Amino acid sequence: MANNNGEISGAKDRRLRLEKVVAALEKVGRETKEMIFRMAQNMRDSEIIYLFNQTTFDLFNILQLVTKRINTEDIYGISGYKSLFENAIKINAHAPIDQFTLFILEYAADIYSQNEDLFLNMAIPDVNVTVGNYFGIIRVDFFRKLWEKMTNDEREMFKDKIILLTTFAHTYLYQSILRNR
């Protein structure tokens, strides 16, 4: 019985998150939504997943460079997260995009507009990707501390990757909707 309650609770959580995403995507500009819709129509699922995962690797590489520069590799453990991510996508390539789509799209309008203050202050929980085990991908407090130590160029590279991840997640959502029509 507990399993059924867990499933019901999980379904409720997903529905509530989806409602928040729908409301958030209404704030995204029409041109952006149209561009992403065209991407969803013209890209294969495997392309979107590949690009999302590659962009995530690029993001990890940026974070590794920053932590090396400021000599905090041991504190942040980015290489460990990168290794876990790499193993996760070997087991299930679409797990990361499946997990993050509804979380990141709740903030899509702010991310697309590059609203740095709202982006840094959004209430993102530490998210787990399930691939037989759990590990945190987003560690918000660590990220905020690291952000303060980034150069402007590093911040710009990071923001570019977050915008790309959001775009691929948005495309993936639209494509899922098109596929289920």
PLM feature spans:
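Short, hydrophobic/amphipathic alpha-helical patches that form generic packing surfaces
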Residues: 160-171
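Terminal low-complexity "docking" segments
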Residues: 2-156, 170-181
